[in-house]
Amino acid sequence: MTILLNSSLQRATFFLTGFQGLEGLHGWISIPFCFIYLTVILGNLTILHVICTDATLHGPMYYFLGMLAVTDLGLCLSTLPTVLGIFWFDTREIGIPACFTQLFFIHTLSSMESSVLLSMSIDRYVAVCNPLHDSTVLTPACIVKMGLSSVLRSALLILPLPFLLKRFQYCHSHVLAHAYCLHLEIMKLACSSIIVNHIYGLFVVACTVGVDSLLIFLSYALILRTVLSIASHQERLRALNTCVSHICAVLLFYIPMIGLSLVHRFGEHLPRVVHLFMSYVYLLVPPLMNPIIYSIKTKQIRQRIIKKFQFIKSLRCFWKD
């Protein structure tokens, strides 16, 4: 494939890649990806519908769960067009403005997910350590402020990245290593020094994932201290059980992120398919698994979903009769 390197940034393009060497199998590879995307969309929309339509679920925990579902939906939809475009139509070319826009949304939504998980850990801390004042501490106004601060912090920290990349001339190959645009991949293609991008990228990671993970760890240390002070064994288990879903969501988000970071920095000798696999796990597994985990582990959500399906089933039986 011949790549035309345009001197004008506005006319320049990047080329995305799927699974190199397996282009003939892209149609088959797209099947599990379609299933994952459909499951993510339906699962998170179901969570949002249940929370929005049931007044008994209008509490702090469920508001934060709704924020997580919105973030997961956004993260899924930000990669869907280019990933399926490559698998179905072999559409590899992407303009720099479109690439930078996708980059902005992917990194902003990833940062927002970290922030929402921190907000959920604060909710768990208040629920376990100060249960009598849960609704008075985390008021609707407070929850709205926490949500807005998550959006603003993420957007403002990520906003400089496209502008830092825009100043470069790209004299290396314009072929990106993934089916979507990421800051780390694009800056490697620049002709000049990328030290500023490296430093600012580390600063963003420290301010988002670094701070959030530290505060989440601290909140669970305080939760564990409170739980261990409870005399009743059953009450201790009940208190811990309320945190299981959130702990799973935290692990699903941070473990793939750490794994992807390690692979990028120290895994140059690894097969390229490992890099691709880790990147897809990082972006697709948390949005896929979060609604499933919360549907299974959260009794109120599980009961409402079952009722919805029973209602739909009864309607179908009614119309058949």
From Swiss-Prot:
The chain crosses the membrane at residues 28-48, 57-77, 102-122, 142-162, 199-219, 240-260, 276-296. Odorant receptor. InterPro entries: GPCR_Rhodpsn (IPR000276), GPCR_Rhodpsn_7TM (IPR017452), Olfact_rcpt (IPR000725), OR51/52/56-like (IPR050402). Disulfide bonds join C99-C191. Its main location: membrane. Residues 49-56, 123-141, 220-239, 297-321 are cytoplasmic. It is found in: Cell membrane. This is Olfactory receptor 51G1. Belongs to the G-protein coupled receptor 1 family. Glycans are attached at N6. GO terms for molecular function: G protein-coupled receptor activity; olfactory receptor activity. The gene is OR51G1. Keywords: Cell membrane, Disulfide bond, G-protein coupled receptor, Glycoprotein, Membrane, Olfaction, Receptor, Sensory transduction, Transducer, Transmembrane, Transmembrane helix. It is a multi-pass membrane protein. Residues 1-27, 78-101, 163-198, 261-275 are extracellular. One of its GO terms (cellular component) is plasma membrane. The keyword Cell wall biogenesis/degradation does not apply.
